[in-house]
Amino acid sequence: MALILSILLTVSPYLARVYEYMPAPGQFVNALPVATAGDTPQTMAAKAEAAIAYNAGKTVCLGAWGGYIVFGFDHPVVNSGDEYDFRIKGNATYASYSQDATRKGGASEPGIVLVSYDANGNGLPDDAWYELAGSEYSSPQTIRHYAVTYTRPNGLQDVPWTDNRGGNGVVPRNEFHQQDYFPLWAPDELTFTGSRLAPNAVDEGENGEHSFILYCYDYGYADNHPNKTDGCKFCIRWAVDQNGLPKDLPAIHFVKVYTAVQQVCGWIGETSTEITGAEDLHPDMPFPDDPSETGLSPMPYANSQPPTAKILRDGQFLILRGEKAYTLTGQTLW
């Protein structure tokens, strides 16, 4: 026990680990972060982690619709109940010019956000996922159970795709980015499933000139509003299950983000969610005393003081209190 206590560290508010990174094809894929022919899913997850963990501030591109990243913190992010719980940083901006003064627009490339609680206590993102119901969740224009398959082209060509609704198209190449747009470490066919939001881009150019404004959705999506606004903040209480019913989670351990729109904006190219970091907005908040309403076991320190420390051991989150150690689901370890 003395050895374990000697290595305890203060938790970081920032994203600490990337578990999976699989972008859809796009003009920044294989560049943000850089991929080589020898890379694997594991090495690319590590590269993505190096780019955005602990507030590193670099950029990870998710590519066209469906491309995703799964990340976590070095501690559970607690559901505050009535406040924003975490933020996801991207590179969205507001334009100083737009024809629609009733809403914000500029460079908004929204990504759908899902969260997961480590119910089995193994430190891996293999439990149920719950979507955070953003402003477009109930929109009749949102397509559920959508699927797209991208196929690797021969050589440096546009990347073709087909969907499960009879649609098809390409992720087009452009003169600005000359690398391969299809993930080098991926199989020759990539299929993604999820929900697709309505296109948010409007061409407001005049006299034959193109000028695309990508309008922001109200709330609940990554890379949708600039980082200094509340629009990049999220509440765990927005979580819903696969039937759209609210899911009361005491905390979350993992976050998944995927590009939510399938559109191409002329010379700008495909719309692609970018991630530059994530932050717990209340990292010192104690775990709730009684999460029993979620179906999870009450914590062993219910109705007492919060634990003295939280650590990660062999991929598993532990809670230490006195000389006892527990998993986050209440299993006594010693």
Please provide the spans of the model-predicted regions.
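Short loop/turn segments immediately following beta-strands, especially the blade-tip
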Residues: 116-122
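Beta-strand signatures of extracellular beta-sandwich domains
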Residues: 112-114, 324
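Residue-level detector of flexible, active-site-proximal loop/helix-junction positions
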Residues: 120, 136, 332
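C-terminal outer-membrane/trafficking sorting elements
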Residues: 295-334
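Residue-level marker of positions within ordered structural domains that often coincide
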Residues: 2-5, 78, 118, 260
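Low-complexity, Pro/Thr/Ser/Gly/Ala-rich linker/spacer regions in secreted
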Residues: 2, 6-11, 286-304
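A domain-level signal for the mature, folded cores of soluble proteins
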Residues: 10-111, 128, 133-292
